[in-house]
């Protein structure tokens, strides 16, 4: 999958929008993303066509 940048709702910003980089798709609507150097999970909501990145509880530790 080719990486791409997109705006997303960020958990640590209380849902405010910021730019993320989508790195990989790991499920039907589950993605690995990078937000300011932090790899975390993000969900894509097909009803509103927006990403929701969880940079608090969804952090991926390598």
Put a short name on every predicted segment.
Residues 1-3, 58-62:
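Short intrinsically disordered terminal tails
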Residues 9-57:
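Acidic, low-complexity, intrinsically disordered interaction modules
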């Amino acid at each position: 999958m080719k990486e791409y940048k997109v705006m997303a709702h960020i958990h640590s910003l209380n849902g405010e929008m910021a730019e993320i980089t989508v790195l990989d798709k790991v499920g039907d609507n589950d993605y690995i993303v990078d937000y300011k150097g932090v790899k975390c999970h993000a969900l894509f909501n097909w009803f509103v066509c927006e990403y929701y990145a969880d940079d608090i509880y969804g952090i991926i530790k390598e």
